[in-house]
Amino acid sequence: MDAIKKKMQAMKLEKDNAMDRADTLEQQNKEANNRAEKSEEEVHNLQKRMQQLENDLDQVQESLLKANIQLVEKDKALSNAEGEVAALNRRIQLLEEDLERSEERLNTATTKLAEASQAADESERMRKVLENRSLSDEERMDALENQLKEARFLAEEADRKYDEVARKLAMVEADLERAEERAETGESKIVELEEELRVVGNNLKSLEVSEEKANQREEAYKEQIKTLTNKLKAAEARAEFAERSVQKLQKEVDRLEDELVNEKEKYKSITDELDQTFSELSGY
């Protein structure tokens, strides 16, 4: 009986121990289940986080691809803008060279115009000298004509007296000799006056030819002055056009430089965004 009691006590003790172990195991099981649930929740959260990160990564990669495409396009636009700026600089240089050549031609034309004006003044002075000389020659010719008239009058008077002496030849030989001497003197003077008149006529013709040549040179100088004036106006017009073109090109260069600065700022902003995105991805 005692053995049975001891055995029952032992079995009860063993039962209690088993119950304690069962409670302990049940508690451990609950804790394990809780840990498993937490782990599953954490795994689920991690999976969701991973999916979100994958989605974010896809979006970032897509944004990066777009940014790279935009960057390539911006680089192309920048290269094109730099090419246009270089072309504009070349055009500006050519225009400046053309402007310098125009200024040189303008200075040359101005110098030639001054020389032509001086030559025209000299021609005007020569023309006035020739006019004065022509007036002097006309006065001299008038004097010679008066002398010629006087000589003719003397010749006629001599002839008349010669006829009178001839009629009185038989009566007064002395008067005849004096009349003949006077007649011979008058004829010699007539010959001298005729010779002088011929020389004056030749001089007058030469003077007329010289005056005609002077008039022709004056017309040529006037035409040359007119041509140089037209060239001067054309050079001034080209210079003014070149100056307006340079101002217009300078405005275009300023506009392109502003666009270039804006594009560089946009490029820097995109680069900063990419660096920030890479930093965030590296943090995860």
UniProtKB/Swiss-Prot annotation:
InterPro entries: Tropomyosin (IPR000533). Changing L260V: Nearly complete loss of allergenicity. Changing R255D: Nearly complete loss of allergenicity. Residues 12-45 have a biased composition (Basic and acidic residues). GO terms for biological process: regulation of muscle contraction. Residues 1-273 form a coiled coil. Residues 43-57, 85-105, 133-153, 187-202, 247-284, 249-260, 266-281 are annotated as: IgE-binding. Changing E145D: Nearly complete loss of allergenicity. Changing F278L: Nearly complete loss of allergenicity. Residues 1-51 are annotated as: Disordered. The keyword Coiled coil applies. Keywords: Allergen, Coiled coil, IgE-binding protein, Muscle protein, Repeat. One of its GO terms (molecular function) is protein homodimerization activity. Constructed epitope mutant has significantly reduced allergenic potency, and hence could represent a candidate vaccine for treatment of shrimp food allergy. Homodimer. Tropomyosin, in association with the troponin complex, plays a central role in the calcium dependent regulation of muscle contraction. Belongs to the tropomyosin family. The molecule is in a coiled coil structure that is formed by 2 polypeptide chains. The sequence exhibits a prominent seven-residues periodicity. This is Tropomyosin Pen a 1.0102.
